[in-house]
Each structure stands twice: as structure tokens, then as C-alpha cells.
């Protein structure tokens, strides 16, 4: 695996070194009180930079009208499946990375990370999942415990890839549309908390749709901000769905992000009908972008497989 970061500016290289230091500090703290044998033996086997900062083409324009900048995308590989638990081992790292970016200003680039075992990554490669194949092809190792390589990818045949993409599209998009209908009904009934939850679920499923169709992988999370970051790496049309230049726009998205838990369980959660309608328009725009991107991807796979039946209208 590549280890060279010479294509990055010196300040980005220094920043990645700082991020790596933070990862190890927080991971060691998370293991410090462990008494079980497996926890004492816990370690990080690899930290891999992937995405735009690995392959080139990153965007760093936080002060423009779009207000978009690429994240450092990191795959952290650990030696035990139990160490992938977000709440137990990685929540404090997430909080610290956000704090050092937004408050302490010791970081200037957002950091986005996922955690898997080597077996999970190699299984993804063995099943021809594009996400893991791209990581193996373009990724840059920032840390390796040993020189144990990732397995050689086994790409799916064109027919297999097409069948899987269609299956994901036909399963996940209707689910997103169903929750969007539920959101509209709930707004009409004046049940704004249910409307917020249903709209969150619609957006979440749209992101799962585009990630699964295009990469055959999606993180098993409900964090809308995290999913948005993952998906927006695929196509800039997904960025356009969410205005984010005004603080008010960003605050509305945060309310939607919180709705997965708070709209169901917190008596203090508040959202207005105007906010919901604005967010609903954004999710509709997101849905149009997802449908277009997935349709194009499936058409591309059909061409490779020598097939060309049209997608059913949605």
C-alpha cells in the first residue's frame, strides 16, 4: 500500500500527523481501564487515508457561497471486531476531532473516519465492493502495525454488479419515498415530531440508496451528517441539495439530524412547520439527485453487461 503524501501541501501533511496522534491518544484512553484480555490486546493495525485527499482533487473552499470543503477520510482497521463499537471506543475521538476543529482551531480540515476489522475489509474486497476496492487502489497508509497486505480484490462480473445495484435501488428508494409520504401526512396532521422523524428516515434511506448502488457499501449508522459526508464524495449534485451558506440553513439541518433520537424521545425537541417544509424541499431535491445518479450508474452497469432495459419510473 502507498505511504507517500508528497502530493499534499506541507500544512495538510502536518495536520494528518496531528490527527493520527489524536487517534492514538483517544484509542489508548478508551482501552486504559480495560481488564479483559481481548481489550488489553486491542490495537490499531492500520490507518488509511482514502477519498479525495488520497487520490487528489480535494475541495477546500469553506468561505465560498457553497461553503464546501473536503474531509480527511480515514479507515481505521482494528484487530478485534469488538473494538469497532462506536459508543464504547470511538465517540470521544469523534467529539475531540470536532472540538479541535471548531473550538480549539488546532485542526483546519474536518475528519471523517470509519472503523472495521481487517477481516471485514478483506471480505469487502473478496465480494467486489467498490468502496473497499477504491480504498485498496487509492488509499495511503498513515500507520501500519505490520506489513500484512489487504487481499487482492475480486471484482464482480458485470452481470453480478448490475444485479446487485438494481436490487439495492429497488429496495431502498421506495423505502425513502414511503417515509417522505409519511412526513407529508404527519405535517398535515400537525404531528411535527413524527414528521421530523419520518423526514430524517427518508433522507437517511436516500443516502443509503446512493451509497449502496454506487459503492456496494454503506455505514451502519443513522447519523445524517456522517452519511451526507460519505455520499457527497460520490457526486457534487448531492452537495447542491443542502444550502449551507447561512447559519440558519445549517441549524435546520442539525435539527433534522437530531430528529432520529430527539423527535421520538425528548420532550424538549422543537421544530416548526416552516422549518419542516424547508427541509422537506431539500430532501425532495436530494431525492431527485439520488435518482439521477443511481439511474446513470445502473445505465453504465447495463452497458457493461450488454443489457439496456429502462429503469421503472419512480
Q: Over which residues does each language-model region extend?
A:
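Terminal alpha-helical segments
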Residues: 7, 84-91, 105-107, 111-117, ...
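Short gly/ser-rich loop at a beta-strand->alpha-helix junction or flexible surface loop bordering the NTP-binding
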Residues: 44-58
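A short, polar/charged loop/turn motif at coil->beta-strand junctions and beta-hairpin connectors
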Residues: 41-43, 257
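Flexible, active-site-proximal loop/turn residues at the rims of small-molecule/cofactor binding pockets
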Residues: 53, 81, 269
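Metal-dependent nucleotidyltransferase catalytic core
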Residues: 2-35, 41, 60-125
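Generic secondary-structure microfeatures
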Residues: 51-53, 78, 201, 206
